[in-house]
Amino acid sequence: MLVIVGESASGKSTLQNMFINANPQYKKVITYTTRPMRKNEKNGADYHFVSVQEFESMIANNAFVEYTEYRGWYYGTAKADCNGENLVAVLTPSGLRALKRYGINTISVYLRFDRRSRLIKILQRGDEIDEAYRRNLSDYGQFNGVENEVDYIINNYDYTHDPQQVLEMLSLAITAEGKKNGI
């Protein structure tokens, strides 16, 4: 499974969608959340948006490889969605660690993006300024040291790489890992 990690508004989901569009044999892992949908999000495409009661029932039934509560909302990756080949997931560092503990073979990429540009993107997508600052600070702690946990790092400060270049980097990473692991 290709796992893309990166702070809020670093371009993870955009990169995931671009990669899948360029490589249709890959399938998006759609995670679950109890948070409200943002404008332009679609249930079953961006997330599985479920109620707290549904999510807690899934926890009780051991349906998740990993889940977390973040600012009052649940987020999680279902075990059933991690079966198969050619999967691409967008996760937090703790989500990546959980997949590895569960025994899922991963190729992990950290999409590094500068704080100022991320803050601007968060505000542009309509988040409140207090929420934007809070997310930026939270990411700082959560992603501290992630460079040592991933297989590859893509520095994408100020969009210096064009999308095609980033896709090529991902493809090279997958090819290299496949050869290394006999895939």
Kindly label every feature range from the protein language model.
Residues 33-87:
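ATP-dependent small-molecule kinase phosphotransfer cores
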Residues 4:
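Hydrophobic anchor at the beta1->P-loop junction of P-loop NTPases
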Residues 12-13:
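Walker A/P-loop
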Residues 7:
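P-loop (Walker A) phosphate-binding loop of NTP-binding proteins
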Residues 21-29:
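Post-Walker A helix-loop "phosphate-sensing" segment adjacent to the P-loop in P-loop NTPases
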Residues 88-92, 101-123:
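Conserved phosphate-donor/acceptor-positioning beta-strand/loop module used by diverse small-molecule
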Residues 127-183:
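Small-molecule kinase domains that catalyze NTP-dependent phosphoryl transfer to phosphate-bearing small molecules
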